[in-house]
């Protein structure tokens, strides 16, 4: 991978986030911010990763990632899969960081109704909508 595509320091990563703050919220900018958060976590800058996590989580809420995307007809099957995977990735990293740092959770399970990615195989799109949207709580397997 070319060196210019990789952050060399935590400072470089934080500067990358400043550019994202000027852009409108979209899935691509959220993915970019989340990748910065992952980078900071990987180099054990957990406090900085947690602070960026506040921005990532709030942006995910603004984009409605905590809601089941199958209930909206405007999303393609690929959009639904990306939204689910991105949300649950954010959720898992947020849980890890709050546990590691001993800070309160910013994503409450009661506020989530998006299904796990790949947790269910639905016959049709209408069944997908019914099974996710009709469930007011977090879908649990096992």
Regions found by a protein language model. Name each.
Residues 110-121:
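Flexible glycine/proline-rich, aromatic-decorated loop/lid segments
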Residues 1-111, 125-142:
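Extended, leucine-rich alpha-helical cores of fungal transcription factors
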């Amino acid at each position: 991978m070319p060196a210019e595509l990789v952050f060399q320091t935590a400072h470089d990563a934080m500067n990358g986030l400043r550019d994202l703050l000027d852009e409108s919220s979209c899935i691509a900018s959220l993915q970019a911010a989340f990748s910065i958060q992952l980078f900071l976590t990987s180099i054990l800058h957990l406090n900085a990763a947690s602070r960026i996590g506040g921005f990532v989580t709030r942006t995910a809420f603004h984009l409605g990632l905590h809601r089941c995307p199958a209930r909206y007809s405007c999303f393609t099957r690929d959009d639904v899969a990306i939204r689910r995977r991105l949300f649950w990735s954010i959720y898992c990293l947020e849980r890890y960081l709050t546990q590691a740092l001993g800070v309160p959770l910013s994503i409450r399970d009661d506020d989530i109704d998006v299904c796990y990615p790949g947790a269910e195989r639905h016959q049709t799109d209408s069944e997908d909508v019914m099974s996710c949207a009709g469930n007011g709580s977090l879908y649990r397997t096992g």
